Structures are given as structure tokens and as C-alpha cells.
Amino acid sequence: AECKVTVDSTDQMSFNTKDIAIDKSCKTFTVELTHSGSLPKNVMGHNLVISKEADMQPIATDGLSAGIDKQYLKDGDARVIAHTKVIGAGEKDSVTFDVSKLAAGEKYGFFCSFPGHISMMKGTVTLK
């Protein structure tokens, strides 16, 4: 199984996939985020955050006041399973996490916590 995926983000507030599939045989999984747009991160920055589906909007809401220096995530937010930094055009960042953090039967998702982006920039994380 390939235990990594690359997800691209754009100036049109979109990810290039709606689902990240993780093979149960993977001990760790790496997500690399790229940005193929042309806008800087303070204008059209994106990150990729993984959490339970039910926690996605609350994490994004709480992260608004944290600001870009903290990746628009509340300090020490235990609901966040993994996240990349906020990146701008031409940049990339990756994060590796233990697949054991994902429980069978629970619904997980990924999203961008940059203010206003979650409505268009989200998807599911599936354990296969």
C-alpha cells in the first residue's frame, strides 16, 4: 500500500480531491499539500487539517482568532489529528501521523482552516 498522498490546492479555493483513502496496513500516513496557484498565503493561503467530521467546523471557527502565524488553529487543539502549515503559491508542506489515531467506524474529514475556506475546501478521510 502507498502510505502517502499529495493534495493540491488552488487560487479557486479548492483541493484536487474530495477523499483521502488510507490503507489500514499503513502504520503512518503522510499528506503533502501543494499550492498550484499564484496568490500569496496572506491572501489565498491553504492548509490541510484532519479531524473527526463533527469537529471540522468547530476547529475552523475556533481557529479564526488564532491568526495566520498559528496556522489558523487554536493552540494545542486536541481535536486536530494532523495538520500542515498554511502555504501560499508554489509552496508545499507535509505532515505524517500515526494511522492508529483513526478509529474504525468513526467519520473523519480534511479541510482548510483559512478563514472562509472550509465551505469549499473539505473532503472525507476513509480508512480502508
UniProtKB/Swiss-Prot annotation:
Record bears the keyword Iron-sulfur: no
Gene3D superfamilies tied to this protein: Cupredoxins - blue copper proteins (2.60.40.420)
Domain of life the protein comes from: Bacteria
Disulfide pattern: 3-26
Keywords: Copper, Disulfide bond, Electron transport, Metal-binding, Periplasm, Transport
Domain Plastocyanin-like, first and last residues per copy: 1-128
Record function comment: Transfers electrons from cytochrome c551 to cytochrome oxidase.
Name of the protein described by the UniProt record: Azurin
Organism: Pseudomonas putida
